[in-house]
Regions:
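Loop/turn-to-beta-strand initiation segments
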Residues: 38-40, 63-67, 96-103
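Conserved P-loop NTPase "ATPase switch" module shared by AAA+ and STAND
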Residues: 43-46, 62-81, 85, 108
Length: 213
């Protein structure tokens, strides 16, 4: 994800993987790191995709660097907004602006939900060209020049995240007790993820503050 200060060479990036693994947090971290150097983020939602070219036209000559950011991006079978996004990424005859980059995060590797019939490429009376349909849907993800996978940590890595966060927030609980409670916490809070670790530490910090009152 680094390299922004060197220029926007890789214009389109997709961060995909399991929920709670830090995709959105990474984007926020980039903004915090480079804000003073002129980085700004514009968050776009699916219903706004048809207006993205107009947005880019308005910001391409400004003295800032912009990330157009789409969080938790995915499309259902009936949605067509992905076609607008493909058109934006591909661009027209004009040169793509050097100060605009597109980032998206998603829990889906292919962004667009596939039907079982799509995967099997089974044609029926309603879709005589199912193979073409499959390729059209899957082609969106290939427009992202850089695709970065975020996987869940294993138990050892999860515990290391908990230790690191505990030290950062000044948690005083003994380590054995801390890790035992963390293991119990993740069972009912989404499993072994960075998000679960952060939520657990937030809970512990709040509990310790209450005890000190």
């Amino acid at each position: 994800l680094a390299g922004i200060e060197m220029g926007f060479v890789e214009l389109v990036k997709l961060l995909f993987g399991d929920a709670g693994t830090g995709k959105s947090s990474s984007i926020k971290g980039i903004l915090n790191q480079y804000y003073d150097q002129g980085l700004r983020i514009i968050e776009a939602y699916k219903h706004q995709f048809q207006d993205l070219n107009e947005v880019i036209a308005q910001i391409k000559n400004r003295n800032y660097r912009f990330i157009i950011y789409m969080d938790d991006l995915s499309f259902e079978e009936f949605e067509i907004e992905y076609k607008y996004l493909k058109a934006v990424i591909e661009g027209g005859l004009e040169k793509k602006p050097d100060n605009v980059l597109i980032y998206a995060t998603s829990n889906r590797r292919n962004l667009v939900r596939e039907r079982a019939a799509d995967k099997l490429e089974i044609a029926d009376e309603d879709d005589l060209h199912s193979s073409d349909t499959v390729q059209e849907k899957l082609s969106l993800v290939y427009r992202f020049g850089v695709r970065i996978y975020f996987g869940k940590p294993d138990k050892k890595q999860f515990q290391e995240i908990v230790r690191t966060l505990a030290a950062r927030y000044g948690v005083t609980m003994p380590e054995d007790e801390l890790l035992l409670k963390a293991n119990q916490w993740e069972l009912s809070h989404g499993g072994l993820t960075g998000r679960a670790a952060q939520q657990f530490i937030d809970y512990i910090v709040g509990t310790e503050e209450e005890k000190r009152k």
